[in-house]
Structure formats: structure tokens, C-alpha cells
Amino acid sequence: MSNFSIPSAHTFLSRFRMPRTLLALVLIFLFASGIANSHAASASVQVFGATGAALPDVAVYAEPLSGPALPKSQKTVDIEQKGRKFLPPMTVIQVGTNISFPNNDTVRHHVYSLSPAKVFDLKLYAGEPENPVNFDKPGTVVIGCNIHDQMVAYIHVVPTPYFARTDTSGKARLDGLAPGKYRLKTWHANLPPAAPIPEQQITLTASDAVTNFTVNMNAR
């Protein structure tokens, strides 16, 4: 076996001949990032439904009660059509996110929504649609196929980057939150139409510890 030695930091950096000013800026950025990460907080959320059972596919999100306005997302995510279903059946995204709707079926689909939060219409197509759809307002968007009525999915658009979807055990975790006060909200497709979105105020401290919260929803 040949000997292998790890070069020193000085040797490694000297190979790139990075200007000292730029190197200093990089080191400052890394140092600041380390501070930010070391003070990030996390919230672990357990959601139970009306029957007392753990509730999957719940949108869980935290809205800061103070601080600067949060930038909109510039991400693109997929909701595919396969087996004449939308997958996943529930998606939670931040305002500003683009969604592409690839059709991986052997038949064409006509994807649309009439929801106030986003009205759009993708005529019959196969494969990749020409352009993704931008979701620029918060709210719940119900999507369907104009050809196959059984195809329904939900998109919950939230005004914060701190969100997750509960797993099969009804659990979700929000990471990277700055210490402070938040409004913790939950949404599920089976909430009664007139029911308010469940919410509670929470406080997260500056530590690496995970704070646990339990939410009970009137949904099945």
C-alpha cells in the first residue's frame, strides 16, 4: 500500500494562489457561517388527528414573529403523474417556488387548478410541460386532471422557508431556525373547510437542542 499524506492547510491553499484579500473574505464568511450554524435551533413536531392516531402528510411550518422579511424561494420541485395519480399527493412549498408537472404515464394529462391561491391550466401533454408553474401567493391549491377526475393533489404554499411534511408516524422536524418567537402552524387536506388553521406560539432558544412540540388536529 502506498503512503498517503494529507497536505497541510498552508500547502493546500497555496496551490490555488488565492489573493490574500479574497482569502480573508472567505475565512470571515466561513467563520460567520459557523457562528450562525452553532446558534441554529430546531423544532420537532408530533401531530395527532381527531382519532388520536398519528397523522401523516401534514404541512408543518413556522412563521417568525419578528425580524426582516424573508426572501422568496427560487427553487423548482416536481409533482409527477404516474399510474394516473399525482405523486406526492400533498406538497408543501414556500412562496416563490416553481413546480414542474412531468407526465410519466402512457396517456396524456390536462393539469389545472381553479384555487384562488393559483389558477393555471396545462393543456393535454405528455412528458415534460413546456414551463414550470410559479406559486407566488400563500394558500392552498387543489390540482386535478381535466381528463381523469380521480386525480387530485394538494399544494400548501407557505410564506416561510421553515416547513416540513409529517411522515407516516406523524412527525416532522424544522431545522435551521434562528432563536426567537414563531407562530407554528399545521395544515391537512382533511381539515373541515371552515376550520381555522391550527396554530400556537413557540419560543426557540439559541442552542443545538431540539425542542419538541405536540399538535392535535381535527382531521382524520
Predicted features along the sequence, with ranges:
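Bacterial N-terminal signal peptides
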Residues: 21-34
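Intrinsic disorder/low-complexity signature
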Residues: 7, 34-36, 100
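Extracytoplasmic copper-binding redox domains, predominantly the cupredoxin/blue-copper superfamily
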Residues: 39-220
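N-terminal regions of proteins, emphasizing targeting and processing segments when present
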Residues: 10, 30-32, 39
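N-terminal secretory signal peptides that target proteins for export/translocation
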Residues: 1-18
